Curated annotation (Swiss-Prot):
Residues 1-26 are annotated as: Hydrophobic. This is Ion-translocating oxidoreductase complex subunit B. Its EC number is 7.-.-.-. Keywords: 4Fe-4S, Cell inner membrane, Cell membrane, Electron transport, Iron, Iron-sulfur, Membrane, Metal-binding, Repeat, Translocase, Transport. [4Fe-4S] cluster 1 binds at C49, C52, C57, C74. GO terms for biological process: electron transport chain.
Amino acid sequence: MNTIWIAVAAISLLGLAFGAILGYASRRFAVEDDPVVEKIDEILPQSQCGQCGYPGCRPYAEAISCNGEKINRCAPGGEAVMLKISELLNVEPQPIDGEEQELAPARVVAVIDENNCIGCTKCIQACPVDAIVGATRAMHTVMSDLCTGCNLCVDPCPTQCISLQPVAETPDSWKWDLNTIPVRIIPVEHHA
């Protein structure tokens, strides 16, 4: 019985010692992130679609901050994201690159023609935001609330049954961009 307690104490002390060493090393050798990259990354839509030419939103944010990359290459974010980045960096806004040249681009979502879907799951694997649901050899469908319209699911489909359809804004589907609404603190008087 005595040897069990010795073993438990020895392992506990080893765990405590290694934890202290790891804690010290993580603080001593910590790499500080660029705060500008962090802010740009927060503004980007995090769809990781690659339409900007980078493998995800974080590498694009690093390229904007460190390499002077154009701020107008995020198609899913559109003009709103470009304007926020230009305001953050205090640079001139630029027209949106690529196919998103319109002033107010229409929101599009992927639509699957379920009669032609063979259930291969290639679209599910390609979707960066997990907006497509279905199982192998079963019908797939797109959850339109989650779809960013990034177009990454269209090309892998072997039966070409996926298309992008514009979504009309209705009072039910339209979402406020709360970050563009100015907020003021109004003093309130309390009367007894």
